[in-house]
């Protein structure tokens, strides 16, 4: 036996340690790309499902500006159809592969940017794969769940197929490029749920990804950090607002800033109070047409929401929705999502889109009316005080939204300025530190101040389990 192999065994024996415990665990430093396409799943969920015992970070900005020196795996789950992988990205990927890094690209036949990317390496996504799927490599063991599109390989001999469909067409394959490994597969072979509840194929994804990353040395002692919303490529100061965006989204930044600044006065008028100090003071642009978020100070806005910039009505509703989430803090609303969109519809109307705004309000209420024509049987959670069956799933969601819109419309019919009066009263009465909770009882108490009449009997009549004696906010006589 060679000395370099014998020495660890001798040391282990002398120290009384099992030699197997001396084997170094392969280390993976994974970077998941959010710059080309933002999804809540890509923001930490992929890592949680498939590399939970390894280090993982995200890149919210341009890929070519990310420091990959201490990374050995790059995960590209998708690219918004409005964007593409630019030449600087391809140069970065080629250099990373040449240095031994692993790159995972998932996609489908309909993903034009992903197809264009893998086309640079001799691959494209084809038609739907046929089940059952089968492993073609020892790394893949156990059941193969999910689905997706097959791969068309221009030089099959350059690739190693890991999974094939019933017709022996490749579904997951890898090839060596430089010292690195390119791994291409059907998007449906991995999870996608924002709550990370669908960790399909986790048993074999981990060894496959670890093997792909094995060609590049990393140092666990050195820093390995991601680039988040606060570290995008560009920062623009516009009054109290800080706008951040990546190189990819630079062509859309001017339009996004303009519509946000144009909408703010209308939002503030509807809310009745200015934003609290620091709230919604930072905006980051997201490469997506669906989904944003608010953390109070920071707001993430989907640049392509509602076919923006071709149309502005849905974008007005969306950015108002996210802004309202910051406006209502520190106490979220009992109808937190619906009221944010409802105010968004009112702002849409104020900004010249009256017909579309009222149509959306009407449609939302009608979805609840189809479940309960009286709109008096259920509360916001689909629970009935009168013995009607509890609502579940989609019906509960339709009731939550429709009932909230209906209540707010009933109040607005009595006082067109009710939203502004309500939020002014809430700002005065719901003080941080003085209030432990802001529930339905507190909500009705604040509405009483805004409307100047007792609303507890009416809310009980329409299905809310509220009691004036349980309100954490004093109820006016």
Whereabouts are the PLM-identified features?
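Zinc-dependent metallopeptidase catalytic helix centered on the HExxH motif
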Residues: 302-370
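Helical hinge/lid and interdomain linker segments adjacent to catalytic or ligand-binding clefts
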Residues: 27-116, 120, 152, 279-287, ...
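Juxtacatalytic substrate-recognition/specificity segment
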Residues: 232-327, 331-332
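Active-site-proximal alpha-helical
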Residues: 267, 339, 347, 369-467
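Sec/Tat signal peptide C-region and signal peptidase I cleavage site
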Residues: 17-21
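Extracellular ligand-binding/catalytic regions of CAZymes and related secreted enzymes
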Residues: 22-30, 35-49, 69-70, 95, ...
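Bacterial N-terminal signal peptides
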Residues: 4-16
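An acidic, glycine-rich "communication" segment
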Residues: 23-27, 43-44, 106-180, 221-225
């Amino acid at each position: 036996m060679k000395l370099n192999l014998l020495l660890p065994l001798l040391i282990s024996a002398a120290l009384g340690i099992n030699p197997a415990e001396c084997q170094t665990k392969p280390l993976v430093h994974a970077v998941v790309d959010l710059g080309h396409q933002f999804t809540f799943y890509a923001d930490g969920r992929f890592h949680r499902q498939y590399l939970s015992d390894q280090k993982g970070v995200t890149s919210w900005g341009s890929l070519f500006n990310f420091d990959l020196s201490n990374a050995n795996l790059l995960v590209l789950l998708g690219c918004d159809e409005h964007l593409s992988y630019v030449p600087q990205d391809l140069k970065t990927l080629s250099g990373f592969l040449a240095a031994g890094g692993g790159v995972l690209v998932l996609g489908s036949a309909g993903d034009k940017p992903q197809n264009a990317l893998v086309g640079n390496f001799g691959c494209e996504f084809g038609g739907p794969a046929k089940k059952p799927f089968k492993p073609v490599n020892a790394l893949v063991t156990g059941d193969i769940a999910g689905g997706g599109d097959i791969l068309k390989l221009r030089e099959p001999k350059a690739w190693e197929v890991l999974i094939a469909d019933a017709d022996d067409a490749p579904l997951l394959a890898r090839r060596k490029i430089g010292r690195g490994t390119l791994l291409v597969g059907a998007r449906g072979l991995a999870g996608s749920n924002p709550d990370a509840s669908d960790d399909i194929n986790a048993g074999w994804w981990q060894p496959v990804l670890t093997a792909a990353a094995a060609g590049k040395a990393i140092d666990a002692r050195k820093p390995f950090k991601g680039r988040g919303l606060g570290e995008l490529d560009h920062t623009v100061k516009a009054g109290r607002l800080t706008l951040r965006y990546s190189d990819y989204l630079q062509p859309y930044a001017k339009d996004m800033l303009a519509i946000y600044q144009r909408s703010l006065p209308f939002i503030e008028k509807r809310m009745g109070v200015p934003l609290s100090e620091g709230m919604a003071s930072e905006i980051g642009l997201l490469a997506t047409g669906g989904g944003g978020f608010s953390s109070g100070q920071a707001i993430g806005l989907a640049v392509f929401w509602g076919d923006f910039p071709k149309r502005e009505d849905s974008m007005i509703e969306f950015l108002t929705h996210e802004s309202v989430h910051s406006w209502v803090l520190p106490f979220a609303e009992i109808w937190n999502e619906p009221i944010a969109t409802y105010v968004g519809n009112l702002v849409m109307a104020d900004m010249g889109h009256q017909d579309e705004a009222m149509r959306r309000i009407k449609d939302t209420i009608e979805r609840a009316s189809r479940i309960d024509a009286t709109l008096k049987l259920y509360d916001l959670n689909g629970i009935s005080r009168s013995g009607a069956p509890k609502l579940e799933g989609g019906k509960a969601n339709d009731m939550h939204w429709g009932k909230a819109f209906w209540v707010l419309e009933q109040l607005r019919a009595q006082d067109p300025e009710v939203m502004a009066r309500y939020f002014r009263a809430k700002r005065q009465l719901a003080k941080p530190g003085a209030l432990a909770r802001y529930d339905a009882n507190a909500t009705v108490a604040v509405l009483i101040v805004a409307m100047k009449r007792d609303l507890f009997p009416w809310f009980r009549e329409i299905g809310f389990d509220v009691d004036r004696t349980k309100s954490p906010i004093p109820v006016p006589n």
